[in-house]
Amino acid sequence: MSSERDQEQLSLEESREGEGKSTTSQTESNASDVAEDPSTKEQTGDKEDSAAARARERKERFKALQARAKSATERNLKETAAETQRLATDPSLLSSLSRKHAFASHNLLKADTEAAGEDFERKRAWDWTVDESEKWDRRMEKKQRHRDDVAFQDYTQDARKVYKRQLREMKPDLEGYENEKMAAIEKAAASGDLEIVETNDGEMIAVDKNGTFYSTADTIGFTESKPDRAAVDKLVADLRKAEEVRLKKRRDRRGGDEDGDVTYINEKNKQFNQKLARFYNKYTTEIRDSFERGTMI
């Protein structure tokens, strides 16, 4: 029995040693395979290269951001300095100084010229041509007429001034007018009311066949015209401006007495009440005060 047990133990030990050797040999073979596999080495190298490339890219982007931040800071400082200088400089003061300098230079030149016994106006005219001098004279004459025309003369003259001012403020749309004109000509030519004829010298003229294209005293085609939104807004703005001017003149005529008692219906009635007040206020003041206090019997 003991011999059989010894044989079994020996066989178990031999089997264990064989399994250990096989495991060791398999591990060594796997390690050798891994060590000798070139694809694994390439994959590891690619990972390291990609990581380095990403690091370099991040570094370059960070440098670019730093450069942009630096340039933005410098630009902001320059703009801030320019804005500070602009705010510190008073434009009205600069224009006043330039006017004073021009006036002083004019007076100095005039004094020097008169001291030398020369004609100042003649000497100053040497700097201008005849055309420039005539244009300047016409401009000064027009300016003087405008100064003389400011005061109220009559309602016809006042209406003429308003009309001239509106003409100056009106900006005609010549391009839009030409486009509408060409569209109307093409429409009339397509309908047969207008015929385009070429002359011998190559000029194109439009012939009104039925006498309906060109307007006459009996033409009512303008009633079909519909103004655009901008023209309507401009008309509304002009009407509001005229109303504001009218109310301002009305307040100026009243002398700012808007909060006082209104005892008149128009300007003429106001003047009449003022005349009455100059003569009868000394007699009626006590009566009016009694009415206001409610003690009048």
UniProtKB/Swiss-Prot annotation:
Residues 1-92 are annotated as: Disordered. GO terms for cellular component: catalytic step 2 spliceosome; post-mRNA release spliceosomal complex; Prp19 complex. InterPro entries: mRNA_splic_SYF2 (IPR013260). Residues 1-20, 38-63, 71-81 have a biased composition (Basic and acidic residues). Keywords: Coiled coil, mRNA processing, mRNA splicing, Nucleus, Spliceosome. Its main location: nucleus. Transmembrane segments: none annotated. Residues 21-32, 82-92 have a biased composition (Polar residues). Residues 54-79 form a coiled coil. GO terms for biological process: mRNA processing; RNA splicing. It is found in: Nucleus. Pfam families: SYF2 (PF08231). Belongs to the SYF2 family. Involved in pre-mRNA splicing. Associated with the spliceosome. This is Pre-mRNA-splicing factor syf2. It comes from Emericella nidulans (strain FGSC A4 / ATCC 38163 / CBS 112.46 / NRRL 194 / M139) (Aspergillus nidulans).
